[in-house]
Swiss-Prot record:
Single annotated GO MF: scavenger receptor activity
Organism: Homo sapiens
Tissues of expression: Ubiquitous. Detected in body fluids such as semen, milk, serum, tears, saliva and urine. Expressed by keratinocytes and fibroblasts.
Record: glycosylation sites: N69, N125, N192, N362, N398, N551, N580
SS bond partners: C49-C113, C62-C123, C93-C103
Protein name as catalogued: Galectin-3-binding protein
UniProt keyword annotations, A-Z: Cell adhesion, Disulfide bond, Extracellular matrix, Glycoprotein, Secreted, Signal
Gene name linked to the record: LGALS3BP
């Protein structure tokens, strides 16, 4: 038995050697210039669905295979039905792509097609007669070496730091004038140019000048700020834009939070509103990690004044947030008035009565701001003990204010966690649901449907009906599930379309109250290191963005995840009062 098995394995491997993802071929056409379109991906050949298939798409295939163009774009399995997976669907090319893999589509292996919809092409019989020798890849390095030689120059470049020369280089006007990125240098009259640079950016000047020659540059977490600053100062718009696009990628790479704080300060100093907004968003979603980092005591007061009012602050609880502010205040960086201003932004009604009582015993800030704490505690106790209709009638309280609404609380009291089953196969619990019977809980992270179904990450949990102590004995039951396929949506009673998958599904039972509504959130977790995005539950489903920028129709995560997928998802329940009492949850 062994030799035949090895023989077939050898044939399989030999058949795919030298083939790369995105390579294409024509099958069953009876001639070399026509056939069913097949494309290679992850070790196997598959077909393309004819949804949106047109002559532009067909021409990309033909040109990639050496033909001049396509004369027909055929569908409905005109050359017979293929086998294997349907690799691409809803392909939309512009005509300049090297492969269908480079065109817009639903993404790899995302299709509802069957093989009776396989796409085909007929190409012109003429093959391209042009044969090109292209050594242009060597040009970049050759130009870089001209700069490295520092010989044959006609331009002197001085690097000045605070009025003193720090470095000197020579340049070649004929090369620099060919690059608009370098126009700030060659537009200067005469043969001498002075660059005024901050001391921290001096080590990057050489790489910047070499980039003007080679048009290639390597950028890291530690250098991106300086390259952005230099590019902004000297009109290198492409480099400036590229650095700006890297901020979202590089921000999460520093677990110490020194770089995000540094970039925030840089954004404020330069008036870069987009970078400032990006930094604030990252710090808000990852606020718990920030409070545990070494950089926490050095967070500027003005930054905290912007972060603490936000409802998208992700923290275990309001008490945990107050304790973090208490720890921060030990650094004596802020005045008494500034600290009091920060305490004002704490949402005391979101802390339980026993937590409020214990503040006087375990919080160093309490006695130095006793009057404020007593006022805030009284406000919170009224919220916890008096029905909101009476508070609104007799106290004139506006319970739609943020003070009376939860943030993103990640403690088990208000949240639950599931993994992506493709990333982790932990099955510590099991829940079974028959086709006709009710859900029966044995204990669980994963859901086992009948034998023809798959396992899907699943979590059932309970929360209080509302943060007010009036509702502490009233529990709401929730079920959270990761839904990667149309079938999984059907299994759990959700309606999904292929272009929105995967999604998170959330169901609620018990605790119905027309005065309470929910603004629930889903946190996308990357490698257990940072929150990459936060999405809303709309109609009991929360979108899961693409972890990396792809050609799919899905939106990309605010902060890309290098792993290419999220390792887990945390759902946070956020109840609030409907003060007009007319809404439904």
């Amino acid at each position: 038995m062994t030799p035949p098995r090895l023989f077939w394995v050898w044939l399989l491997v030999a058949g795919t050697q030298g083939v790369n993802d995105g390579d294409m071929r024509l099958a069953d056409g009876g001639a070399t210039n026509q056939g069913r379109v097949e494309i290679f991906y992850r070790g196997q050949w598959g077909t393309v669905c004819d949804n949106l298939w047109d002559l532009t798409d067909a021409s990309v295939v033909c040109r990639a295979l050496g033909f001049e163009n396509a004369t027909q774009a055929l569908g409905r399995a005109a050359f017979g039905q293929g086998s294997g997976p349907i690799m691409l669907d809803e392909v939309q090319c512009t005509g300049t792509e090297a492969s269908l893999a480079d065109c817009k589509s639903l993404g790899w292996l995302k299709s509802n097609c069957r093989h009776e919809r396989d796409a085909g092409v007929v190409c012109t019989n003429e093959t391209r007669s042009t044969h090109t020798l292209d050594l242009s890849r060597e040009l970049s390095e050759a130009l870089g070496q001209i700069f490295d030689s520092q010989r044959g120059c006609d331009l002197s470049i001085s690097v000045n730091v605070q009025g003193e020369d720090a470095l000197g280089f020579c340049g070649h006007t004929v090369i620099l004038t060919a690059n608009l990125e370098a126009q700030a240098l060659w537009k200067e009259p005469g043969s001498n140019v002075t660059m005024s640079v901050d001391a921290e950016c001096v080590p990057m000047v050489r790489d910047l000048l070499r980039y003007f020659y080679s048009r290639r540059i390597d950028i890291t977490l530690s250098s991106v700020k300086c390259f952005h600053k230099l590019a902004s100062a000297y009109g290198a718009r492409q480099l400036q834009g590229y650095c700006a696009s890297l901020f979202a990628i590089l921000l999460p790479q520093d677990p110490s939070f020194q770089m995000p704080l540094d970039l925030y300060a840089y954004a404020v100093a330069t008036g870069d509103a987009l970078l400032e907004k990006l930094c604030l968003q990252f710090l808000a979603w990852n606020f718990e990690a920030l409070t545990q980092a070494e950089a926490w005591p050095s967070v500027p007061t003005d930054l905290l004044q912007l972060l603490l009012p936000r409802s998208d602050l992700a923290v275990p609880s309001e008490l945990a947030l107050l304790k973090a502010v208490d720890t921060w205040s030990w650094g004596e960086r802020a005045s008494h008035e500034e600290v009091e201003g920060l305490v004002e932004k704490i949402r005391f009604p979101m802390m339980l009565p026993e937590e409020l009582f214990e503040l006087q015993f375990n919080l160093s800030l309490y006695w130095s701001h006793e009057a404020l704490f007593q006022k805030k505690t009284l406000q919170a106790l009224e919220f916890h003990t008096v029905p909101f209709q009476l508070l609104a009638r007799y106290k004139g309280l506006n319970l739609t204010e943020d003070t009376y609404k939860p943030r993103i609380y990640t403690s088990p009291t208000w949240s639950a966690f599931v993994t992506d089953s493709s990333w982790s196969a932990r099955k510590s619990q099991l829940v079974y649901q028959s086709r006709r019977g009710p859900l029966v809980k044995y204990s669980s992270d994963y859901f086992q449907a009948p034998s023809d179904y798959r396992y899907y990450p699943y979590q059932s949990f309970q929360t209080p009906q509302h943060p007010s102590f009036l509702f502490q004995d009233k529990r709401v039951s929730w079920s959270l599930v990761y839904l990667p396929t149309i079938q999984s949506c059907w299994n759990y009673g959700f309606s999904c379309s292929s272009d929105e998958l995967p999604v998170l599904g959330l169901t609620k039972s018990g605790g119905s109250d027309r005065t309470i509504a929910y603004e629930n959130k889903a946190l996308m977790l990357c490698e257990g290191l940072f929150v990459a995005d936060v999405t809303d539950f709309e109609g009991w489903k929360a979108a899961i963005p693409s972890a990396l920028d792809t050609n799919s129709s899905k939106s990309t995560s605010s902060f890309p995840c290098p792993a290419g997928h999220f390792n887990g998802f945390r759902t946070v329940i956020r109840p609030f009062y409907l003060t007009n009492s007319s809404g439904v949850d």
